[in-house]
């Protein structure tokens, strides 16, 4: 019996090895950097809100058996184009964000469909294909926005375009600037729409999560006839969150250190709501027939075909949904930054999103919402804290920058090696 328990503990540790390792790295880096708890919490909330949707966009392709979708770069480009156009048309604020999202969605549907069709031609090689497709798309994007805008595509806007003089001495505008600043009303339009102090939000979150937990347990006991233990397990995500929030609420009342850490922390409510809605959309899709088809295709394409599922169509739909969600994620990301680096903002989107997902404990063939948020928190804490820790240790923040690059690509490499090892 003791040996069985020992094996079970080892199995759990092996399964959660990556998140545990990065949790330790985060704690050590925070300690070395000497940054205050309030700074770390504020920066983490900002970065989770900025990046979460991009990482959520990876879930459906993983479920569909296509691995980690590096081609979300195309969705990011679609979102960027929407933001560039609303800046050109001077549609500012939340209406501008909505218009940009609609434009991005349409473009992402087209690009996602083409990507899905390509993936159907290279089954089993989707990840490397998605990565190379991203590089190719970057080249096409640069060609359009450096040379074609203003010359082939009619557009004149001194605010966002480069100018030069022709032989006749006339000012002409060709190509976009490297950096396009959003108008004041568009910068942080979503984040600043509604903010609340964390100390006021915490009790409401606690009551909300507790209520949802009770409803799920009651539904499982009443409708599905499950016992209490199985019902609690079905609601484990909400239950664990409720317990954590409850402990935090107690500490807020009893610990001055915790009060100080959270005293100035603000939460962008609208951003959180949008992230929650996108997560609910993905979860809802997984509960529908389409979601069951996606899971079946991911497990075994031959079995799915025998069951009458249109495998190619299902894979295209999963790719389209991933690309569309990525376009929304890039819009949320860039409004938080306040500008768009026209030719650079999208380049590392896929790599950073994939790395964050893997840090959360996901793999090529399995990804959950819990892993999305665990990975987002851990990866981005390391992302902003390692340069500060490097500066303290070596008086050179550049070493921290090198570690960030090593961290990102190293995670992906190790994950692929472990996946191949398990298959042997």
Task: Give the role of each language-model region.
Residues 26, 39-89, 109-127, 357-366, ...:
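Single transmembrane alpha-helix segments in multi-pass membrane proteins
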Residues 138-196, 223-228, 237-260, 387-394:
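Extracellular/periplasmic helix-loop junction at the C-terminal end of a transmembrane helix
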